[in-house]
Amino acid sequence: FKTVLSELQNKSEEIEIIDLYRCSFARPRDQLVESFKKLIIWSENIYIISPVWWFRLTPRTETFFDEVFTPGFAYKFINITKTYAYPKPFLKDKKVRTYITHGSPSLPVLTLYLNSVKLRLVMGVYTFVFGWRLSLFTKSRQCWSVPFVSEAKRKKYLESVKRDIKKDIIK
């Protein structure tokens, strides 16, 4: 998070931060959800940063998706038949980059679990909301064994984040 923030600040980008763990998710949360939707509409670039817990993003992140990226705001279903419809995204103009941190090494997640965390996120959330595009896969970066990597590896991860941000803000 700090690297993303400092790189954006260095480029004088206008920034709004949603820290899901500083927000009260007590019900009713209609005003909170509406404030999130306004920020999504306002934004050009969206950065989602989350650790993985139990092969999914954190509960707050998942709740954010469930309550903000709703039908009518983020997408709508277009019927093809009586029983089949496809999602038409309303946020296709947004650029999305995601950083997912894992405590586990890459090998079991990518092989035994078929990269299910990233696959579910991109196919099950992002394509509904942001549309079908290859960049949703390529701009969803996973960092592996984060609590256990060397300082050199950690710096390598952070350097890749810096490169990503520089690419994102070239207009």
Residue map of PLM features:
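Short, solvent-exposed loop/turn segments at secondary-structure junctions
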Residues: R22-C23, W53-W54, G103-P105, S145-V146
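Short, glycine-/small-residue-rich phosphate/pyrophosphate-handling segment
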Residues: F77-F128
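Low-complexity, flexible helical/coil segments
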Residues: I17-S24, L39, T81-F90, G131-S140
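Short hydrophobic/aromatic-rich motifs at helix boundaries and adjacent loops
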Residues: V33-K38, D93-T98, L134
